[in-house]
Amino acid sequence: MLRKTIWLGQPSTTLSHLPVVQKQFLSAFLILCLSFLISCGGGSTDSSGGGGTGTGGGGGGPIGSPTVQHVGIVVFENQNYADVIGNSAMPYLNGLVQQNALATQFYANVHPSIGNYFMMTTGQVVTTDDNFSGTISGDNVTTALTAAGKTWKSYAESLPQAAYVGGDQYPYIKHHNPFAYFDSVQNDSVQRDNIVPFTQLHSDLSANSLPDYFFVIPNDLHNGHDCPAGGSNCPLSDRLGTIDSWLQSNLGPMLLDSHFAGNGILIITFDESANDNTMGGGRIAAVFVGGPVKNNFQSTNTYQFPSLLRFTLKTLGVTAYPGAAAQAPDMKEFLK
């Protein structure tokens, strides 16, 4: 570059013929230009940071990258955030919190349960009647997944049989299984076959045939709704301890399995708080676990179930979001 003829007022004057002062000026000018070019060629800055803390990575691949192949949700029942996070009765779950990511300001949308299950899967409350026995038409998480060529399953503990869309068979409770209400599932035998007993999850994991999206439904003895032996007369620590041990025994092995650990995300949450009405359904825990999730990360941004629905779809590369999920705040900050 310095061999090129440079014009400074006289024709055919090259660098070697310039006076010392001009050489110094030109050298400084060239260094300044080079510095400018280097600074312009640097990496871009992502300005979409969220209100989070921790040691998570700074950006990684975009949501929907091939590194995320499975997204699952397990939903427990009726517990306040403050009763779950940091509670010594739940050492396994709180250990996962320390290693993964936590939404510290996550709120259910409504009371009672059923409206939150529908919000997680349709982006609408639909009803607040836990005894609702109708069917639901329109877009939902399964129609969005199917249209995008993705697979799904609902793994329900104590489900009487595969493809069952009937009423309660205690300790299986229908209104904890929103998929059983969708007409797009009820009227299609292929879709209906995606509602399976929970035991099928272990078989699918062993066969490396986990679906892209899955929803785990513990029964009422294990989800914190009832006491472990039935009924409602037991200390809270008994219910929380049962949730924790069930989670560790039944989903802990999956989190360590090579078919899931590196490319899967499990979201552990609750349908509603026990006695808090903040933002409709109260503050609840939402824990994000898996290889693609930031480590030791805590978000202080406010979210509700429409954002969770959006996250589960968008992370798998789906671009159509039902109901309120279409405009819900993005949760991409939880990914590496």
What do the PLM-derived regions correspond to, one by one?
Residues F36-S39:
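C-terminal motif of bacterial Sec signal peptides marking the signal peptidase cleavage site
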Residues M1-Q22:
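N-terminal secretory signal peptides that target proteins for export/translocation
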Residues K23-I31:
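Sec-dependent signal peptide recognition
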Residues W7-L8, L15-S16, C33, S47, ...:
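Serine/threonine-rich, low-complexity intrinsically disordered segments
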Residues G42-K336:
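N-terminal pro-sequences and low-complexity stem/linker regions of secreted or lumenal proteins
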